[in-house]
Each structure stands twice: as C-alpha cells, then as structure tokens.
UniProtKB/Swiss-Prot annotation:
Major subcellular site: secreted
UniProt superkingdom: Eukaryota
Any Pfam family hit: Toxin_cobra-type
Protein name listed in UniProt: Short neurotoxin II
Protein purpose: Binds to muscle nicotinic acetylcholine receptor (nAChR) and inhibit acetylcholine from binding to the receptor, thereby impairing neuromuscular transmission.
Annotated compartments: Secreted
Family: Belongs to the three-finger toxin family. Short-chain subfamily. Type I alpha-neurotoxin sub-subfamily.
Entry GO terms, CC: extracellular region
Distribution of this protein across tissues and organs: Expressed by the venom gland.
Keyword Secreted carried by entry: yes
Signal peptide from the UniProt entry: 1-21
Molecular function GO terms recorded: acetylcholine receptor inhibitor activity; ion channel regulator activity; toxin activity
Length: 83
C-alpha cells in the first residue's frame, strides 16, 4: 500500500511539473534567436515594436509591459509565442 501511494505521488509530481516556467524569445530586432526561462509566476511573453531614426525596432521578453502610444505590443501565453 505504501509503495502504491509513493508511486502515485511521484507520478503526480512528474505530470504536474511543479517547477514549470514559461519560456519566451528574448532577442532584440535582428539578433539571432535566443530564449530565456521566465521567473516563476510570469506566464506571458511579449513582442514590442516601434520605429525610430534607426528604423524598425523589436523587443521581446517575459511579461506583458505597459507601452506608450505608437508602440505595437503583442502579448501571448504559450511557449516561444512571441517571435
């Protein structure tokens, strides 16, 4: 009985993946693709775009920041969704 209980606990921990964190792209503009694991509790990714004297700028990362008018922001909640 104890063995069955222990097996159920192990299976539950493995299935729930208690240490799960969201993974988002974090490269800027035309840099090579890179990803990062977000801090615990951070469940969204963002893609922020704007234009300046250098041209079109893209910023990616974890979270969903507040932006100023004129900046396009797309937030999403799945793995690597902010490319």
């Amino acid at each position: 009985m104890k063995t069955l209980l222990l097996t159920l606990v192990v299976v539950t921990v493995v299935c729930l993946d208690l240490g799960y964190t969201r993974r988002c792209y974090n490269q800027q503009s035309s840099q090579p693709k890179t990803t990062k694991s977000c801090p615990p509790g951070e469940n969204s990714c963002y893609n922020k775009q704007w234009r300046d004297h250098r041209g079109s700028i893209t910023e990616r990362g974890c979270g969903c920041p507040t932006v100023k008018p004129g900046i396009k922001l797309r937030c999403c909640e799945s793995e690597d969704c902010n490319n």
